C-alpha cells in the first residue's frame, strides 16, 4: 500500500485547526515527520522546540481552516 503523504499532511493541518488556541497556536501531538513537512511548506513555524504547541503561519492558519471546513463539516 502506498501512503499519500499530501493527504496525511492535509488531515493533520485540518486537525490543528480543531486544537487552535491563542489565535494561531495548536497542540503538538502529531507525527514529527508530518510536522517537519508542514514546516518545510511554510504552514507552521519550526516545530523543534520545548513548547507543547505549534505556531501556524498566516498561510497555515488560512489553509487549516479551509481544510477543516472541507473535511469535517457538513
Curated annotation (Swiss-Prot):
Q: Out of the domains of life, which is the source?
A: Bacteria
User: Mind telling me which InterPro entries this protein's record contains?
Assistant: DUF6429
A Pfam family recorded for this sequence: DUF6429
Q: Which UniProt keywords apply?
A: Plasmid
Its name, as the record gives it, is: Uncharacterized protein y4hR
Give the species: Sinorhizobium fredii (strain NBRC 101917 / NGR234)
Amino acid at each position: 500500500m502506498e501512503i499519500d503523504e499530501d493527504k496525511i499532511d492535509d488531515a493533520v493541518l485540518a486537525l490543528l485547526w480543531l486544537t487552535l488556541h491563542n489565535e494561531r497556536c495548536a497542540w503538538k501531538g502529531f507525527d514529527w515527520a508530518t510536522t517537519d513537512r508542514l514546516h518545510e511548506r511554510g504552514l507552521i513555524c519550526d516545530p523543534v522546540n520545548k513548547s507543547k504547541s505549534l505556531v501556524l503561519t498566516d498561510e497555515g492558519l488560512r489553509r487549516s481552516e479551509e481544510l477543516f471546513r472541507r473535511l469535517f463539516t457538513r
